Amino acid sequence: MAPKKIGAGKGDSSILAKISNYDIVSQGRRAACDAVYVSKKLLKSTGKAAWIAGTTFLILAVPLILELEQDHRLGEIDFEQASLLGTPPVGAML
């Protein structure tokens, strides 16, 4: 024979039914549903904003970074060639 569980009687279901009919419970459910709705909307708009920021960065900032890096490399190559040819660097003439 299975052991009797505490709180599994018929009286408990009627107590739960009575409690769930209270106005405060329905207000709590409504507040929870509203919070979920607002959270979903916020996540959706945050995702859109992140997409816009990411694509803007890729379109505008990445080419700029690559161009600056290439300019820096060309400057280093010019400096190295100047030092190999024996011409003094620009800062050494002062």
UniProtKB/Swiss-Prot annotation:
It is found in: Mitochondrion outer membrane. Its main location: mitochondrion. It is a single-pass type II membrane protein. InterPro entries: Tom22_pln. The chain crosses the membrane at residues 49-66. Residues 1-48 are cytoplasmic. Expressed in roots, flowers, young cotyledons and leaves. It comes from the Eukaryota. GO terms for molecular function: protein-transporting ATPase activity. Keywords: Membrane, Mitochondrion, Mitochondrion outer membrane, Protein transport, Receptor, Signal-anchor, Translocation, Transmembrane, Transmembrane helix, Transport. Residues 67-94 are mitochondrial intermembrane. One of its GO terms (cellular component) is mitochondrial outer membrane translocase complex. One of its GO terms (biological process) is protein targeting to mitochondrion. Central component of the receptor complex responsible for the recognition and translocation of cytosolically synthesized mitochondrial preproteins. Together with TOM20 functions as the transit peptide receptor at the surface of the mitochondrion outer membrane and facilitates the movement of preproteins into the translocation pore. Forms part of the preprotein translocase complex of the outer mitochondrial membrane (TOM complex) which consists of at least 6 different proteins (TOM5, TOM6, TOM7, TOM20, TOM22/TOM9 and TOM40). Belongs to the Tom22 family. PANTHER family: MITOCHONDRIAL IMPORT RECEPTOR SUBUNIT TOM9-1, MITOCHONDRIAL IMPORT RECEPTOR SUBUNIT TOM9-2. This is Mitochondrial import receptor subunit TOM9-1. It comes from Arabidopsis thaliana. The gene is TOM9-1.
